[in-house]
C-alpha cells in the first residue's frame, strides 16, 4: 500500500513539475498572450476611463468583510498571466509594490507584471482577485485582457462587493464599476 501511495505522489509531483517547467519555458520566450478586444457580455458602462483613485489593495484587505461594498486601487498583475482564461477574472496588486519594470532595467524580465522581483509575502498581502459576474455570481464567460484598457500593469480602481475573504490572504471582489487610468 505504501508503495502505491509513494508512486502516486511521485507521479503527481512529476506531472506538476512538468507543468510548471512548461509554463516557465513559455514565459521566458518573450511571447505574450493574445490580446482580446471584444466587449461581448460585459455590462455597458462597467469599464470606463477615469482617475482610478482610492485605497490600495493591502489596506483594503486588512479591513474588508465579506458582503461589504469597497473600492480599491491596484495594477493588473501578480502572475505571469493575471487574466482568467475565457473568464472575466483578473488580479490586481497594490500600487505600493514594485513590478519588475519599476526596477529600472527594462530588459530584466519578459513579464514584469508577474512581480517576481517582489517579496512573495508582500505580494500575497497586496493581491486581490476581481470578477465580473452574471446575475448568479458566476464569472462571465468572456476574456477581458485588452478590453477597454485592461492590460497588464494598467492602474484600475474597482468598486464592488467582497464575495470571498479569509485569513489565508484571499480577497475576491465582484466588480460593479472599474475605472482604468
List each language-model region with its residue ranges:
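Bacterial N-terminal signal peptides that target proteins for export
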Residues: 2-17
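C-terminal motif of bacterial Sec signal peptides marking the signal peptidase cleavage site
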Residues: 23-27
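OB-fold and OB-like single-stranded nucleic-acid-recognition modules
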Residues: 28-181
Amino acid at each position: 500500500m505504501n508503495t502505491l501511495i509513494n508512486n502516486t505522489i511521485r507521479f503527481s509531483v512529476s506531472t506538476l513539475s512538468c507543468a510548471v517547467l512548461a509554463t516557465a519555458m513559455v514565459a521566458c520566450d518573450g511571447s505574450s498572450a493574445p490580446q482580446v478586444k471584444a466587449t461581448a457580455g460585459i455590462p455597458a458602462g462597467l469599464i470606463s476611463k477615469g482617475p482610478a483613485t482610492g485605497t490600495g489593495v493591502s489596506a483594503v484587505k486588512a479591513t474588508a468583510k465579506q458582503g461589504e461594498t469597497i473600492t480599491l486601487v491596484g495594477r493588473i498583475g501578480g502572475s505571469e498571466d493575471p487574466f482568467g482564461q475565457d473568464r472575466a477574472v483578473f488580479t490586481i496588486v497594490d500600487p505600493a509594490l514594485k513590478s519588475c519594470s519599476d526596477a529600472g532595467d527594462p530588459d530584466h524580465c519578459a513579464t514584469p507584471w508577474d512581480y517576481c522581483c517582489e517579496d512573495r509575502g508582500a505580494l500575497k498581502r497586496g493581491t486581490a482577485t476581481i470578477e465580473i459576474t452574471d446575475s448568479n455570481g458566476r464569472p462571465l464567460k468572456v476574456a477581458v485582457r485588452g478590453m477597454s484598457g485592461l492590460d497588464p500593469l494598467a492602474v484600475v480602481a474597482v468598486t464592488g462587493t467582497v464575495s470571498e475573504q479569509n485569513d489565508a490572504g484571499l480577497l475576491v471582489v465582484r466588480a460593479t464599476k472599474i475605472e482604468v487610468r
